[in-house]
C-alpha cells in the first residue's frame, strides 16, 4: 500500500495526552555523617524517580548501615574488599569508599536507569571531595547468579579464596522472602572463610511478616553461617499510616553472619 492510498492525520501510535501517568523524576537525597569532623560531612545521592523494588527511597536501614560502617570503619572497612548487594541508593558503599576500603563492588538489579544513578552518585562524590575515593565498580547482578561473570566477565569462573570479600552488605533485603536462598548462596560463594562477615540490616516493613523476615537467619544455618545480633534500635517509621504497627515498623535490626565452614 502506497502512502497515497491512506492518510491518517496525527501519529497513529502516539498515546492520547494524559493516557499514562507521567514518570516520576529523579530526585536527590542528602545524608549527614555522624562522625565529628568527617570530610565531607554530607553525601548526596541521586535516586530514581520510581523503582518496583523501592530503590527510589533512602530507607532507615540504609542510614543505619552507613552510620555503623562509618563508626566502625577501622575494623570493617579500611583495607577490606567490600560487596554490597541490592544497593539502591548505594549509601553504605559511598561511605565505604570514603573510609579507605581496598575495593568496593556495588550491585543491584541490572536496570540501566538504577545503575546509572548509583554511578552518578559516586562520580558526584569524587568531584566534591578533596580526598581520593576507594576503587569502586557499579555492576548489575541478580542474586544467585554467576559470580565469575560479575567480577571478572568470565562466566563459570570460581572465586579463589583470596579473591573473595571481607564484608558483604545486605541492607533492607530480607523482606524479599522468596530470595533468601539466592542471597545466602551468593554470600556463601563470595565471602572469605577467615575473618569475613555479612552485615545484615533491615526494618520490618510488613509487621505481620516479621517472622518471615527473621526466618532468613534460620535459613542461614543451612549455608553454615552463624548469626550474631548487633542490636535492635527504634527510629521514626518511614511512613505514618497504620499507627497500630508503627512501633514495629520503627525498628531497625542489625546482625552479622559469620562463616562456620572449614
From Swiss-Prot:
GO terms for biological process, alphabetical: methylation; rDNA heterochromatin formation
GO molecular function: N-terminal protein N-methyltransferase activity; protein methyltransferase activity; protein-lysine N-methyltransferase activity
Keyword Signal: no
Any single GO CC term annotated in Swiss-Prot or TrEMBL for this entry: cytoplasm
Keyword entries, A-Z: Cytoplasm, Methyltransferase, S-adenosyl-L-methionine, Transferase
Function per UniProt: S-adenosyl-L-methionine-dependent protein methyltransferase that trimethylates the N-terminal glycine 'Gly-2' of elongation factor 1-alpha, before also catalyzing the mono- and dimethylation of 'Lys-3'.
Family: Belongs to the class I-like SAM-binding methyltransferase superfamily. EFM7 family.
Protein name listed in UniProt: Protein N-terminal and lysine N-methyltransferase EFM7
Taxonomic source organism: Candida albicans (strain SC5314 / ATCC MYA-2876)
Amino acid at each position: 500500500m502506497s502512502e497515497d492510498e491512506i492518510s491518517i492525520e496525527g501519529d497513529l501510535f502516539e498515546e492520547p495526552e494524559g493516557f499514562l501517568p507521567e514518570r516520576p523524576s529523579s530526585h536527590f537525597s542528602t545524608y549527614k555523617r555522624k562522625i565529628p569532623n568527617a570530610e565531607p560531612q554530607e553525601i548526596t545521592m541521586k535516586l530514581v524517580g520510581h523503582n518496583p523494588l523501592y530503590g527510589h527511597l533512602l530507607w532507615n536501614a540504609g542510614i543505619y548501615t552507613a552510620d555503623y560502617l562509618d563508626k566502625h570503619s577501622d575494623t570493617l572497612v579500611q583495607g577490606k574488599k567490600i560487596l554490597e548487594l541490592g544497593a539502591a541508593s548505594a549509601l553504605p558503599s559511598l561511605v565505604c569508599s570514603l573510609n579507605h576500603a581496598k575495593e568496593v563492588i556495588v550491585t543491584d538489579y541490572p536496570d540501566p536507569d538504577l545503575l546509572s544513578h548509583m554511578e552518578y552518585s559516586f562520580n558526584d562524590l569524587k568531584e566534591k571531595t578533596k580526598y581520593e575515593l576507594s576503587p569502586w565498580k557499579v555492576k548489575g547482578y541478580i542474586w544467585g547468579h554467576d559470580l565469575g561473570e560479575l567480577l571478572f566477565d568470565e562466566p563459570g569462573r570460581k572465586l579463589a579464596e583470596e579473591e573473595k570479600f571481607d564484608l558483604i552488605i545486605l541492607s533492607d533485603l530480607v523482606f524479599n522472602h522468596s530470595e533468601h536462598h539466592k542471597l545466602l548462596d551468593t554470600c556463601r560463594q563470595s565471602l572469605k572463610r577467615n575473618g569475613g562477615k555479612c552485615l545484615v540490616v533491615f526494618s520490618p516493613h510488613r509487621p505481620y511478616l516479621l517472622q518471615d523476615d527473621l526466618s532468613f537467619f534460620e535459613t542461614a544455618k543451612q549455608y553454615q553461617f552463624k548469626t550474631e545480633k548487633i542490636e535492635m534500635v527504634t527510629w521514626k517509621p518511614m511512613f505514618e499510616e497504620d499507627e497500630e504497627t508503627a512501633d514495629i515498623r520503627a525498628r531497625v535490626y542489625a546482625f552479622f553472619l559469620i562463616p562456620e565452614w572449614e
